[in-house]
């Protein structure tokens, strides 16, 4: 699933093509993805100017004066910017034409979403999917003190707390495993048992790993590509994720794989305590 770095890479890729431009048309090639496409979406967007782009966790936000288009890439989605006239393929479900370019959403498994939040409904942060999200890990509110305070009553494993998204947002399965490794924290440790000093290491690791992943175009494991069609390459730098049985890059102990909350977790039993 595309995580925060992949969505931020996508946002930065589409922004120069969208911001300040007028939408000339929308094509929907299915009734919807995870949820139905909004009614009359073509009429809602046609002729309207895109003011800016944003991101909240794993959601791409495209802002207009009269509302915000909310896009989620789901498990297997990606967005490309293409010239006019490029024929759609089987899994190309949404096109938005801007100038002489087309923003095209491809989603083979159809777990993504394209939703509309009208301005009269209030701030987009109050949308049902966004209102309970935690702080952004690359912004100032995200600190070790925040993690420490918010986890005093959390008896769940720290890996599952990171994935929940209500304390810190956008840290998915890949980057949670990698961040916990860099911080030296066993993913099975109950969150409330972790002290402030260890949260200092974890907060720093999350920031550094997410920033590095963005700089390297995200991770391409199966489906994700950037808007220009290029793959990310952060996966070349994984220390533990998807390296079951391979030697730890630090101590040579075999990397272990366990299941937490129906998700695979990867860690080094020697380096992570």
UniProtKB/Swiss-Prot annotation:
It catalyses: Hydrolysis of DNA containing ring-opened 7-methylguanine residues, releasing 2,6-diamino-4-hydroxy-5-(N-methyl)formamidopyrimidine; 2'-deoxyribonucleotide-(2'-deoxyribose 5'-phosphate)-2'-deoxyribonucleotide-DNA = a 3'-end 2'-deoxyribonucleotide-(2,3-dehydro-2,3-deoxyribose 5'-phosphate)-DNA + a 5'-end 5'-phospho-2'-deoxyribonucleoside-DNA + H(+). Binds 1 zinc ion per subunit. GO terms for molecular function: 8-oxo-7,8-dihydroguanine DNA N-glycosylase activity; class I DNA-(apurinic or apyrimidinic site) endonuclease activity; damaged DNA binding; zinc ion binding. Disulfide bonds: none annotated. Its EC number is 3.2.2.23, 4.2.99.18. It comes from the Bacteria. The active site is at 2 (schiff-base intermediate with dna), 3 (proton donor), 58 (proton donor), 263 (proton donor). Its cofactor is Zn(2+). One of its GO terms (biological process) is base-excision repair. It holds the Pfam family H2TH. A zinc finger (FPG-type) spans 239-273. DNA binds at residues 91, 109, 154. SMART domains: Fapy_DNA_glyco, H2TH. Keywords: DNA damage, DNA repair, DNA-binding, Glycosidase, Hydrolase, Lyase, Metal-binding, Multifunctional enzyme, Zinc, Zinc-finger. The keyword Thylakoid does not apply. Involved in base excision repair of DNA damaged by oxidation or by mutagenic agents. Acts as a DNA glycosylase that recognizes and removes damaged bases. Has a preference for oxidized purines, such as 7,8-dihydro-8-oxoguanine (8-oxoG). Has AP (apurinic/apyrimidinic) lyase activity and introduces nicks in the DNA strand. Cleaves the DNA backbone by beta-delta elimination to generate a single-strand break at the site of the removed base with both 3'- and 5'-phosphates. Monomer. NCBIfam families: fpg, PRK01103.1. Belongs to the FPG family. This is Formamidopyrimidine-DNA glycosylase. It comes from Herminiimonas arsenicoxydans.
């Amino acid at each position: 699933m595309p995580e925060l770095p992949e969505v931020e890479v996508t946002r930065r890729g589409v922004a120069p093509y969208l911001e300040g431009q007028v939408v000339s048309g929308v094509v929907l090639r299915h009734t919807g993805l995870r949820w139905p496409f909004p009614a009359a979406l073509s009429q809602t967007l046609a002729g309207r100017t895109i003011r800016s782009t944003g991101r909240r966790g794993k959601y791409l936000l495209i802002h207009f004066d009269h509302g915000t288009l909310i896009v989620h890439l789901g498990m297997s989605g990606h967005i490309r910017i293409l010239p006019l006239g490029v024929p759609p393929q089987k899994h190309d479900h949404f096109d938005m034409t801007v100038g002489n370019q087309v923003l095209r959403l491809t989603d083979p498994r159809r777990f993504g979403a394209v939703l509309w939040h009208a301005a009269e409904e209030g701030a987009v942060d109050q949308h049902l999917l966004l209102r309970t999200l935690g702080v952004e890990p690359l912004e100032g509110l995200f600190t070790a003190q925040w993690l420490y305070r918010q986890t005093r009553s959390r008896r769940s494993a720290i890996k599952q707390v990171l994935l929940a998204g209500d304390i810190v947002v956008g840290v998915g399965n890949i980057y949670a495993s990698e961040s916990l490794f860099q911080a030296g924290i066993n993913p099975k440790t109950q969150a409330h048992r972790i002290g402030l000093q260890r949260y200092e290491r974890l907060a720093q690791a999350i920031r550094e790993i997410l920033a590095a992943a963005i700089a390297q175009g995200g991770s391409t494991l199966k489906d994700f590509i950037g808007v220009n069609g290029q793959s990310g390459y952060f996966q070349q730098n994984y220390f533990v994720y998807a390296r079951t049985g391979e030697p730890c890059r630090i101590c040579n102990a075999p990397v272990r794989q366990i299941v937490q909350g129906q998700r695979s977790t990867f860690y080094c039993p020697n380096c992570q305590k």
